[in-house]
Amino acid sequence: MTILRTMRNFSSMNIAASILLFVAAIAAAIIANSPVAPVYQEFLLHELHLQIGNFNLLSHGGENLRMIEFINDGLMTIFFLLVGLEIKRELLVGELSSFRKAALPFIAACGGMLFPVIVYMSICPPGSAGSQGLAIPMATDIAFSLGVLSLLGSRVPLSLKIFLTAFAVVDDIGGILVIALFYSSHVSYGYILIAALLYVLLYFIGKRGTTNKIFFLVIGVVIWYLFLQSGIHSTISGVILAFVIPAKPRLDVGKYIEHIRHTIAGFPVVESGSIVLTNEQIAKLKEVESASDRVISPLQSLEDNLHGAVNYLILPLFAFVNAGVVFSGGGELVGSVGMAVAAGLLFGKFAGIYFFTWLAIKIKLTPMPPGMTWKNLSGIALLGGIGFTVSLFIANLSFGANYPVLLNQAKFGVLSGTILSGLLGYIVLRIVLPVRKRK
């Protein structure tokens, strides 16, 4: 049921959200190469303040956060909170909740993370300029890839959608681990200790039945600030916060149905022509509303609340401030880093996902899902090369402002690799998927 719910969520918003994300990226590239590029750069470097007395929440190391840092380190924490909620749900009741369900997507994701690194290292070997960006082509953008898949409508078997979603979730886990382990420096353990104590506090408060989302989010902001000062990348705080958000509703579904039936049976009946509810009717409806709130777990409720803000505000903003590739410079635009990232996404992702899936099925480690064929698997493996969001994120962590030329190359590689993977994946699937006859 949970994966079907995920499909419904994505099918309703994924195409529009993916288009908005793409438009934001194109707008950034156009502006970065236009006469107003200095204004764009000034916007990215604009310093922010959120003063509470003498305390500035938006500061790090004694310096104010700039706009690009606020979006990458602040707003993207909300994105990673949503990713964490989705991962937790899939681990509890979804496609990663058992070995049988998780085996094939997990194996495919491992290949999809390993091969891009190998391809990247073959172009940018260890010790060379740009070698620190080897993790950039590891990730698959769930929203973008499912958005492309949604363009094919009912021709796509549900098993393919489930497979793509599941291995992309495992990819996200890999990306999060990479960020946590390899992009942290000068760790201040005092801040981490306080954050850990707050996580433990939230866990036990959730266990005692507290389900107030606002309370968890307010403490989450405090934890985010502690991570920001600690040296561990602040977005990790959002992922960990997701795992202490209660997944159990306050009201059991069976009791909810019984309560609703009882409430409806006692609903006061008035004259059919009346357009105004009585106080008694309003009271009964409020009982239904309250029960409906309590039957939805904080985890699912928060996940549902965040989808719109993340897909239509945060990710487009992220794309706008990070996808501004400067096209002047000729060879400097592509370079070894650009080639390595693009090749990693296009060839590494395809080869890793396809080969590891083929191997797992051939040695009978796991069966081929119904509806999957070797031909349509090739299309799904190509869509796995749509790395956009997390790839751009890791590119900024890898190079940042210290290596602007390499960062520009990495951005170009992410954009070109993502576009080529998405386009080829769509074409292959459009060719190999049967057209369903209308009844």
Curated annotation (Swiss-Prot):
This is Na(+)/H(+) antiporter NhaA. Keywords: Antiport, Cell inner membrane, Cell membrane, Ion transport, Membrane, Sodium, Sodium transport, Transmembrane, Transmembrane helix, Transport. The lineage of its organism: Bacteria, Pseudomonadati, Bacteroidota, Bacteroidia, Bacteroidales. HAMAP family: NhaA (MF_01844). NCBIfam families: NhaA. GO terms for cellular component: plasma membrane. PANTHER family: NA(+)_H(+) ANTIPORTER NHAA, SODIUM ION/PROTON ANTIPORTER NHAA-RELATED. It is found in: Cell inner membrane. The chain crosses the membrane at residues 12-32, 67-87, 103-123, 133-153, 162-182, 186-206, 214-234, 314-334, 341-361, 379-399, 412-432. It comes from the Bacteria. GO terms for molecular function: sodium:proton antiporter activity.
